[in-house]
């Protein structure tokens, strides 16, 4: 067995401490997941309903509200912006904007974004994870991002920043089988000549429960979560191993070099500074006092990856922000935010209880109880059998008295209106309304009023979107930092726009157009940009309303036909514009010939 690394023991101890600290949040979040999946009742509640001959199927208003909220927030992909800090860098802003869109496309950004919003809504916390895929592009690598299940991430419980910037560290746990690890790291299949074992066989396995918590409610629906299927495979190679990626902050030296003659300033890391010190010309300038050198300490993120008792690898990421970007929902100034499901669970339980009472009353009304005087019927069981036969003749002794049917009291109209009121409160808390779901009865009579109401109805969703856009902006900054260090070779970025136009830029290619781009990737002082997200870019828009506005502007002469045509759903916009140009040219030629 390989000897344990001291650093690994420290990381495992932190994992245990931070996991224990979030145990209460984990239980509540798992209960939220159960509610989303339709498992609203505990085992005792389900058994009680079955004893009453009532179904344990809830009237699940919460699910539809969550799905509608997700549809509104993720209607369209976000639009990134890159604002240069200096006027000289303005020509490269579109390059960075294209790179961010390119990374979004190759990372399946639309699907990933929707899953993050799902976790954000259900558990209260979603995660983006930016990384470099070393195998992509035939080994040249690509900067990508994905989503992370919130149960796989543990955070320093002392963090108070919304994006956990003040946390001493973050940990990402992944449970692999033996075969999965060998696929990812073939080096682990190498045989130790001393004992004849593969390296992976000398690594400690993982014998604890999955990082995904177990349910607390009865599984009334056919939902198969990771805690359910974790033991389905018992064959060869199914042994479990825990891989922990530990992200921590360290200080890295950088050097700010100023040329006192020209006023130019550059910033170099230690490796480039050592190369610069070997330059004789630079040494002469430094000896003459013409160069000012200042060492500064900058925060960078260190990644330490452990497997069992060994350190698999570790390196420093050229970013001052954690590559794991949280998307907290109802912020509580801790790493344990609340979710929309948790905020509305009591309303859903109330709705289930009201429906149970209504169902119980319906059962009592449809199956009337029969009260018989004692001794008037000889065989009660025979009476119960004959009672179900509409043509049966039943004998009884009237001297004991007449049979009696006690009728239940009718339900009040206020009770019957309770479900609608509860559904309204759930929609109100989620910031969605029936009109936004296509309910014609809740819509105004005119189209203009409907569009205005739809716009007003999205204000709650837009408020929550502001918080989500903050996390998207943070993700863009991390991608910017990783891409700036990674894309140091010649590469072409192509992105197809929604109007079928193609944006194409080549980096690290020296010609009149993009010679400065290569300098941007090699020099940290050139090309500093502030990455942002265009507000409301992911929200749905009313295309009929937009088209009417553009048509009015076109008819008023405020815009040309090209701008108006780009807002339509016509597929071949470029072809239409080309044919219109040809027609106009022919008309001009005909007019000139007639003159």
Predicted region positions:
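Extended alpha-helical, oligomerization-prone segments that build pores/tubes and scaffolds
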Residues: 1-595
């Amino acid at each position: 067995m390989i000897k344990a690394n001291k650093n690994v023991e420290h990381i495992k101890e932190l994992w245990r401490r931070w996991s224990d600290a979030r145990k209460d949040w984990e239980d509540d979040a798992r209960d939220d997941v159960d509610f989303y999946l339709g498992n609203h009742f505990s085992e005792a509640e389900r058994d009680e309903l079955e004893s009453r001959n009532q179904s344990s199927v809830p009237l699940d208003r919460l699910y539809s509200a969550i799905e509608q909220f997700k549809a509104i927030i993720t209607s369209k992909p976000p639009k990134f912006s890159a604002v240069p800090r200096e006027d000289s860098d303005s020509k490269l802003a579109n390059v960075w904007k294209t790179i961010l869109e390119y990374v979004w496309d190759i990372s399946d950004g639309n699907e990933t974004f929707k899953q993050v919003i799902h976790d954000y809504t259900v558990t209260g916390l979603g995660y983006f994870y930016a990384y470099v895929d070393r195998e992509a592009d035939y080994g040249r690598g690509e900067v990508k991002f994905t989503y992370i299940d919130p149960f796989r991430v543990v955070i320093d419980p002392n963090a108070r920043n919304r994006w956990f910037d003040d946390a001493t560290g973050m940990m990402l746990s992944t449970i692999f089988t033996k075969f999965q690890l060998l696929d990812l790291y073939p080096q682990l299949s190498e045989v130790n000549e001393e004992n004849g074992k593969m390296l992976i066989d000398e690594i400690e396995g993982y014998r604890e429960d999955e990082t995904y918590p177990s349910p607390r409610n009865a599984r009334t629906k056919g939902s198969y979560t990771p805690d359910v299927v974790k033991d389905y495979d018992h064959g060869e190679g199914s042994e479990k191993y825990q891989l922990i990626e530990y992200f921590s902050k360290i200080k890295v030296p950088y050097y700010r070099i100023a040329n006192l003659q020209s006023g130019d300033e550059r910033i170099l890391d230690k490796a480039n500074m050592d190369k610069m010190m070997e330059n004789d010309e630079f040494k002469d300038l430094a000896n003459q006092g013409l160069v000012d050198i200042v060492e500064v300490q900058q925060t960078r993120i260190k990644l330490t990856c452990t497997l069992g008792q060994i350190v698999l690898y570790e390196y420093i990421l050229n970013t001052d922000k954690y590559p794991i970007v949280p998307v907290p929902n109802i912020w509580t100034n801790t790493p344990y935010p609340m979710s929309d499901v948790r905020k509305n669970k009591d309303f859903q339980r109330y709705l289930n209880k009201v429906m149970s009472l209504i169902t119980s009353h319906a059962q009592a009304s449809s199956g009337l109880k029969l009260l018989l005087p004692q001794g008037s019927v000889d065989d009660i069981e025979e009476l119960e059998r004959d009672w179900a036969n509409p043509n049966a003749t039943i004998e009884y002794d009237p001297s004991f008295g007449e049979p009696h049917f006690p009728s239940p009291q009718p339900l009040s109209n206020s009770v019957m209106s309770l479900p609608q009121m509860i559904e309204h409160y759930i929609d109100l808390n989620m910031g969605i309304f029936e009109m936004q779901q296509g309910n014609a009865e809740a819509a105004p009579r005119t189209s203009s009023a409907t569009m205005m109401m739809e716009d007003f109805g999205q204000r709650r969703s837009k408020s929550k979107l502001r918080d989500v856009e903050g996390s998207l902006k943070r993700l863009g900054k991390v991608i910017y930092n990783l891409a700036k260090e990674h894309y140091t070779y010649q590469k072409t970025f192509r992105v197809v726009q929604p109007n079928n136009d193609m944006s194409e830029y080549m980096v690290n290619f020296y010609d009149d157009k993009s010679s400065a781009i290569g300098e941007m990737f090699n020099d940290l002082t050139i090309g500093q940009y502030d990455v942002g997200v265009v507000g409301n870019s992911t929200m749905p828009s009313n295309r009929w309303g937009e088209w009417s506005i553009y048509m009015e502007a076109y008819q008023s002469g405020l815009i040309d036909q090209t701008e108006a045509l780009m807002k339509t759903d016509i597929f071949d916009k470029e072809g239409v514009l080309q044919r219109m140009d040809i027609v106009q040219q022919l008309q001009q030629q005909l007019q000139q010939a007639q003159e």
